[in-house]
Regions:
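Short amphipathic alpha-helices in soluble, non-transmembrane regions
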Residues: 18-23, 48-59
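Short amphipathic alpha-helix segments
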Residues: 6-28
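Conserved short beta-strand edge segments in small beta-sheet-based binding/regulatory domains
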Residues: 27-32, 55-75
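Short, flexible coil/linker elements and helix-boundary hinge sites characteristic
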Residues: 1-3, 21-23, 62, 75
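Serine/threonine-rich low-complexity intrinsically disordered regions
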Residues: 11, 25, 40-43, 69
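Short, low-order "capping/linker" segments at domain edges
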Residues: 41-53, 70-86
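Ser/Thr- (and often Asn-) enriched beta-sheet segments in non-cytosolic proteins
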Residues: 4-8, 36-39, 67-69, 76
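Short glycine-rich, basic-tinged beta-strand/loop micro-motifs
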Residues: 1-4, 30-45
């Protein structure tokens, strides 16, 4: 069973950085000024690999925030007072 995974960021540029790190081909879109990536995960392990890719990209690129939504859950990454890009 496929699970829809939605990744949201502060901007399309931030979403493009994350899309490059995902283990599947993904494209970033802009929606109401936010960056959005939509992908389908085939398993819990693949969902976890998406979350790990977002986490790595978030830290490496010093993004302001990112949110991963899947099933009825979400994982939020925030800068919390650290200097950020952009």
């Amino acid at each position: 069973m496929s699970v829809r995974v939605t990744i949201e960021t502060a901007s399309k540029a931030d979403a493009e950085l994350i899309a490059q790190r995902l283990p599947v081909k993904a494209s970033a879109e802009s929606w109401r000024g936010f960056g959005v990536i939509r992908v389908a995960a085939r398993s819990r392990e693949e969902t976890n690999s998406f979350i790990e890719a977002v986490s790595r990209s978030f830290q490496e690129n010093k993004l302001r925030w990112a949110r991963v939504r899947y099933d009825d859950e979400e994982r939020v990454f925030k800068a919390n007072g650290h200097p950020t890009a952009g």
